[in-house]
Amino acid sequence: MTINVESATAPRWPDVVAAFGLRGSNPDSCWCQRFREHDESSNRAALRRELDEAEIPVGLLAYVSDQPAGWTRVVPRRTLAGICGNRALQRVLDDNDSAWWVTCVTIRKEHRGLGVGRALLDAAANHARDNGASVLDGHPVDTDRLKAKPSPSALFSGTLAMFEAAGFHEVARTYPSRPVMRMTLG
C-alpha cells in the first residue's frame, strides 16, 4: 500500500469529490466551507470555485494505491472568518499573519487507520512552510476526553492522536475535548 499526497487543483476536482465519499453527492454538505464566508449557491460550488481560482492550493488530496482517500484544507488562518471570529479561539491564539490552519482531515471510511491522516498532516506542514507559514495550527478532537464514541462526522477536524503523531504539540484548549495543536515551521 502506497500513500501519496498531492495538491488539490482544479484538474483534480473529480478526485476531491471522490475523497469526500458519500458526502460528495450532497452539494450542501460542508465541503470544507464551515469556517469560510462565500456567496455561492452551495458549499460544493464554493469549493469548486476556490480550486479553480486559487493561486496557492487550498487543500491536499491523499491517495492510497492511486485511489482518492482523503482531503485536508490548509490555508492562512487569517482567511478563515469562522476561526478568526471564534471567541474561544480568540482567547488562546496570538495575532500572527503567517499562521496557517488545518480545518479538516477527511478520510474515506475504507482508508481510516492506515496512516492517511498522518500523511495529510505531514504534507500540510510542508505546504504551509513552503508558502511562508511560521506555524501550522489545528483544532482536533481529544477522543479520550469524550463521554461517548463520536460519529465520524464529529471528527472532521482530526484527532489529537493524529496531530501528535505528526509532531504537533498542544498550546491550549477551548474545551476539555478540544485542544489547539501547533507545529512550529521555522
Where are these regions (language model features)?
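Conserved N-terminal entry element of GNAT/NAT acetyltransferase domains
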Residues: 1-37
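Active-site rim helix/loop that mediates acceptor-substrate recognition in acyltransferases
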Residues: 30-59
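Conserved acyl-donor/pantetheine-binding loop and adjacent beta-alpha core of acyl/acetyltransferases
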Residues: 54, 63, 68-105, 112, ...
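Short hydrophobic/aromatic beta-strand or adjacent loop that forms the aromatic wall/cage
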Residues: 57, 176-181
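Active-site beta-strand termini and strand-to-loop segments that position acidic
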Residues: 63-65, 183-186
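Conserved hydrophobic beta-strand within the GNAT/NAT acetyltransferase core sheet
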Residues: 102, 136-138
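Conserved acetyl-CoA-binding loop-helix of GNAT-fold acetyltransferases
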Residues: 102-107, 113-130
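Conserved active-site alpha-helix within GNAT-family acetyltransferase domains
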Residues: 129-134, 142-172
